[in-house]
From Swiss-Prot:
It catalyses: D-mannitol 1-phosphate + NAD(+) = beta-D-fructose 6-phosphate + NADH + H(+). One of its GO terms (cellular component) is cytosol. It is an enzyme of class 1 (oxidoreductase). GO terms for molecular function: mannitol-1-phosphate 5-dehydrogenase activity. Gene3D superfamilies: N-(1-d-carboxylethyl)-l-norvaline Dehydrogenase, domain 2, NAD(P)-binding Rossmann-like Domain. InterPro entries: 6-PGluconate_DH-like_C_sf, 6PGD_dom2, Mannitol_1_phos_5_DH, Mannitol_DH, Mannitol_DH_C, Mannitol_DH_CS, Mannitol_DH_N, NAD(P)-bd_dom_sf. This is Mannitol-1-phosphate 5-dehydrogenase. It comes from the Bacteria. Belongs to the mannitol dehydrogenase family. Keywords: NAD, Oxidoreductase. One of its GO terms (biological process) is mannitol catabolic process.
Length: 386
């Protein structure tokens, strides 16, 4: 049986990556920093994935185990035997995981000649490249030659909404997910024999990553931020608001036009994808809170993330953005007190004023036309709150 080692046993790890690997016949071992999650996985050796649709379905993920991140020797042993290593730890944790992988790979180089594929399954552009850069940093030619020959670092685009919805759990590690999923992998960087059900192997991943990051994640964040300002609790409520829906669809059209120009892709196929995204947001079973989707606004409004990157793309290909600016402005007004980044963002605005704050948060030039347009929408939306 093929063996997979997955770092990050959170909802995405269990409800998407681990679920799909297990379904594809892999023996899955999770690695996590949460003792509670690790202990529960090992206690029950299984969990249920509840698929939120009509009627609700349940699938059992069996014969799984878990290790605590600090169980170094056991994690190393599992790594030495693995055919595939995946992560869903959050982009900010990739550097520290990369440092650990470097140690494990050096040990594997001496003990196992089998090829290995390592994939970062994160909500970010080319996250596996980030992981690989950490692994190869300041390394000698011999180690890098080994990596080039035996270790694949394919980038991925992953997509499945895993909301923090309250469900009737039979086991503490049960997880609820939407029915839809997508997992695209760079074909030309694979070294081993990947056998994952439902995965698409692609020659050029960038259009897939940007389509997902901009048209799904960007639209999701826009719905959340506007929904928060209008007092909605859930995404499915917000997307039914005619004003919010018009802005979200408008920003998707702007982005689809830009992506079709950049990649010479049919705009209609991009708009069909965007329409599917809207339907997913409408699913009332997800009970997806706007505060969950909007969390960490400093990250979501950063230079290469879901809102600023497509804004810059529109500008680069000659499209005058309008609707996308409302999502950014609404994000800047996300003042949820339970979110440390939202609190920090308010401090930036109070300390610097809006234009300088936008520059600090997004990296956009303070005196640029784009920042001026964001400022206009910021005060337009803020005025409606008073």
């Amino acid at each position: 049986m093929l063996k997979a080692l997955h770092f990050g046993a959170g909802n995405i790890g269990r409800g998407f990556i681990g679920y799909l690997l297990n379904k594809s016949g892999y023996e899955v071992t999770f690695v996590d920093i949460s003792k509670e999650i690790v202990d529960n996985i090992n206690k029950y050796k299984k969990y249920n994935v509840i698929i939120l649709k009509e009627p609700v379905e349940k699938e059992e993920v069996k014969e799984v185990k878990a290790l605590h991140l600090e169980e170094e020797d056991k994690v190393l042993d599992a790594f030495l035997e693995a055919d595939m290593v995946t992560t869903s730890v959050g982009v900010s944790n990739l550097s520290s995981i990369g440092g650990r992988l470097k140690k494990y790979l050096k040990a594997r180089k001496e003990k196992n000649e089998k090829p290995l594929d390592i994939m970062a399954c994160e909500n970010a552009l080319f996250a596996t490249d980030v992981l690989r850069e950490r692994v190869v940093k300041e390394e000698d030619d011999d180690f890098i030659t080994y990596l080039n020959l035996k270790v694949g670092f394919p980038n991925t685009a992953v997509d499945r909404i895993v909301p923090a919805v309250k469900i009737d759990k039979k086991l503490p590690v049960d997880v609820a997910v939407e029915e839809f999923f997508e997992w695209d992998i760079e074909k030309n960087k694979i070294k081993g024999n990947l056998q994952i059900e439902g995965v698409e192997l692609v020659d050029d991943l960038k259009p897939y990553i940007e389509r997902k990051l901009f048209l799904l994640n960007g639209a999701h964040a826009t719905t959340a931020y506007l929904g928060y300002l209008r007092g909605y609790t859930y995404i499915h409520q917000a997307i039914k608001d005619d004003n919010i829906r018009a802005i979200v669809k408008g920003m998707q059209e702007e982005i689809s036009t830009a992506l079709s120009k950049k990649y010479d892709v049919d705009k209609e196929s991009l708009m069909a994808y965007a329409e599917k995204v809207i339907k997913r947001f409408e699913n009332p079973y997800l009970q997806d809170e706007v505060t969950r989707v909007g969390r960490e606004p400093l990250r979501k409004l950063s230079s290469e993330d879901r809102l600023i990157a497509p804004l810059k793309l529109c500008s680069e290909v000659g499209i005058t953005p309008n609707f996308i600016l409302y999502g950014i402005a609404a994000g800047l007004l996300f003042d949820y007190k339970e979110d440390a980044q939202a609190v920090k963002m308010r401090e930036y605005v109070e300390q610097f004023g809006i234009k300088k704050a936008v520059n600090v948060i997004t990296g956009l030039e303070e005196e640029s036309d784009l920042v001026e347009e964001i400022e206009k929408r910021y005060f337009e939306l803020k005025g409606k709150l008073i």
